[in-house]
Amino acid sequence: MNKIIPAILATDISDLELKVAQIPDEVKLVHIDILEKDIYTDIDIDFEAHIMTKEPDKFASLWVERGAKGVIVHKLSENILHLKNRTKLGLGIEFNVPLEEMLPSIAKVDFIHLMSIAQMGEQGHPFESGIFDRIKKVREKFPQVEISVDGGINTDNYQKLLDLGVNKLVVGSGFKKLWNSLTKK
């Protein structure tokens, strides 16, 4: 179950607190989506921060200071690469970005975070089945790299992702249904 990570996209602090409170006790890590609005309060669970802002340098450092166990960015810079000394650094790759453009950067990070939806920043978008080929390509070139996949994951597709060697499944709107299907057996 450590492979299934709930994604939280909060609109304000009370929404963040409410969503964290709804996470099952067995979950040890949450994934917080960070948009342009800075929403933060102390939470009682380990978290990683997915930085989807225009100024990733500023926000990535801030979330590392707040205790993020991992930070995911979509653009690498020297400032961000230095964060690797303080937390796990992930490279987010949007679904519509050609993998070939990002391959040189993969060796510089601790893990890659492949988006499996066409549009980031909102939950509930449909799963893009083309992610399966993207995972295979990454595995061929980087057999040891940790891979997380984010977006549209549900009871119909999660097992195939795990079978392809995905290390973490980041699940937003479908988390409760997937979690319940796996824990209520």
Task: Tell where the protein language model's regions lie, with residue ranges.
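A structural preference for long, well-packed, hydrophobic secondary-structure segments
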Residues: K3-L18, I39, L62, R66, ...
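Glycine/Thr-rich beta-alpha phosphate-binding loop at enzyme active sites
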Residues: F95, M102-F142, L178-K185
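Hydrophobic faces of well-ordered beta-strands that scaffold small-molecule active sites
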Residues: K3-I8, V30-I32, D46-I51, K69-V73, ...
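Catalytic cores of alpha/beta
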Residues: L18-I23, D57-E65, N96-K108, G152-L169
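N-terminal active-site wall of soluble small-molecule enzyme domains
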Residues: T11-A21, D25, H31-K84
